[in-house]
Amino acid sequence: MSANQVKLTPKDILEKEFKVSMRGYNQDEVDQFLDIVIKDYEAFQQELDELRQENARLKRQVEELQKRPTTPTGTTNYDILQRLSNLEKHVFGRKLYE
């Protein structure tokens, strides 16, 4: 839902005046109902703002994570230490470990 689709603001609802006719609606009931609508509208607007901020934060986080180099799958510190140990044995011979 973009801001362009929203037709009313809480202020628009608050300031809306209805014409009175002889057999019109009870003005107090209309006012009470509009008060509820305004509160809901404000809550929805606040939640929408929070979700937009969270969305922007998560997009930034995704971008940062995508920039980080990835380690090859299955390569752990233990695997690296094993490879290093094997290379040392090969280069220096078994005397180092005896």
Curated annotation (Swiss-Prot):
Keyword Cell cycle: yes
Keywords: Cell cycle, Cell division, Cell shape, Coiled coil, Cytoplasm
InterPro entries: Cell_cycle_GpsB (IPR011229), DivIVA_domain (IPR019933), DivIVA_fam (IPR007793)
Cytoplasm as UniProt keyword: yes
Major localisation: cytoplasm
Domain of life, source organism: Bacteria
Subunit structure: Forms polymers through the coiled coil domains. Interacts with PBP1, MreC and EzrA.
Name assigned to this protein: Cell cycle protein GpsB
